[in-house]
Every structure is written in structure tokens, then in C-alpha cells.
């Protein structure tokens, strides 16, 4: 089965055709002669465009190849660097914080410094008022940064280097306290007792094994019994 032929390829147009005709809307009346003229003009322009496109393809194919100035890697690297620096989406993310001198975008109804406490908005547009408010706020901020900040000692007359002397009541209380010996010192001595602090005042008890060498020492210590004369006197 052969494919159907393109409609209106050959003139004249079939009588009674009421479909689309190129350039017919630019004519005054849709007559049959005007329809034939419009279709003929459209065919000529289409053929002329095809010939120009064919000539361009031939010129490109026969043109001598240009010598590359840089390598392909250098060109791709330059394009990638340019994309990172000047891409619109990256610029929006990088420069989100705008300077104070720049007024807000039209329709922005957020906070505007110095707008309610000054007369910058009297008889001016919103953009001019916003620009003046931001400019005044920036000047106040810069002036506050350059101002001399007085230190705490200069404002309240307090010196941080000098230590405050203790009050006389504290000194009197310290004089009334007794001076106890320092037991944390290992070789310290008590001035009241006149001996080292760790010395036992009692005489050490010795077992009787040293006096009786014939009796084996069991490691136990026994008290000597009192004599009958001492017990009678007691």
C-alpha cells in the first residue's frame, strides 16, 4: 500500500477547501486566487530555506579545520571554573546577605530599622525611605564601633590589679583564734608538749622474754602481778 500524498503539494487548491492556509490571514479576503498565491509564496520560502541550509552544511564540511589554541582539558577546566564563579544559583547562595545600603526588593514588608522613629518616610517613596533608613542605621552602627569604650575600672572606679585589704573586724577575729599545730606536716612538733607530734608519750611495753631467755617467746605480753606488800599498802 502506497503512502498518501501530501495535501496541497501541487496547485491549484482543491475547490471548497476551508482549512489552514499559510499567510492567508494577512490577506484582505479569502478568495481562491489569494489562497493559491499564499501557498505558492510559502512553498518558495520553504525551498529557499532548504537550499540555504544545504549550502551551509556544505560550507562547514569543506572548511579547513582550525588549529586548537588550548587543549580540551584546559577548556573544560576554564568552563567549570566559570560555572562555579558565575552560575546564577551559586551566586544566590553565596551572596545571600546584602549590604545595608541596598534597599529591599519591591513588595517586601519586613522590619525596617529607623523607619518608625524618624521622618525619612515623609513625602518619599518606599524605596527612598528604605535606603535612607538603612543608611542612617549603618552610620549609627559605625559610630558606635568607633566610640571609645570605657573599661569597667574607669566607669566604677574599681582597680582590678590591687587586692582589697581585709576589714579590721576580720583581723580582730583572726587574732582571737588559737594557733593549732599543723598535723599535716610529718616532722612537725607541738610547741606546748615539746616533743614530736607522732611520738607516743607512753613507754612501750616489752615482753618478758628478753629477761627470761630460757622460756620461749610466744609473742604475748602479760602484766606483772602486784606484790603482796604493795597490795596491802594499797
Curated annotation (Swiss-Prot):
InterPro entries associated with the record:
SPMIP5 (IPR043246), SPMIP5_dom (IPR055215)
Q: Where in the cell is it found?
A: Cytoplasm, Cytoskeleton, Flagellum axoneme; Cytoplasm; Nucleus
Q: Which UniProt keywords apply?
A: Cell projection, Cilium, Cytoplasm, Cytoskeleton, Flagellum, Nucleus
Look up the coiled coil feature and give its residue ranges: none
Task: Kindly list the GO CC terms recorded for this protein.
Answer: cytoplasm; cytoskeleton; motile cilium; nucleus
Q: What is its main location?
A: cytoplasm
User: According to its UniProt record, in which tissues is this protein expressed?
Assistant: Expressed in testis (at protein level). Strongly expressed in peritubular cells and Leydig cells and weakly expressed in the cytoplasm of spermatocytes.
Outline the subunit composition.
Microtubule inner protein component of sperm flagellar doublet microtubules.
Q: Which PANTHER family match?
A: CHROMOSOME 10 OPEN READING FRAME 82, HYPOTHETICAL PROTEIN LOC681006
Biological role stated in the UniProt entry:
Microtubule inner protein (MIP) part of the dynein-decorated doublet microtubules (DMTs) in flagellum axoneme. May serve to reinforce and thus stabilize the microtubule structure in the sperm flagella.
Which protein is depicted?
A: Sperm-associated microtubule inner protein 5
Which gene is transcribed and translated to give this protein? SPMIP5
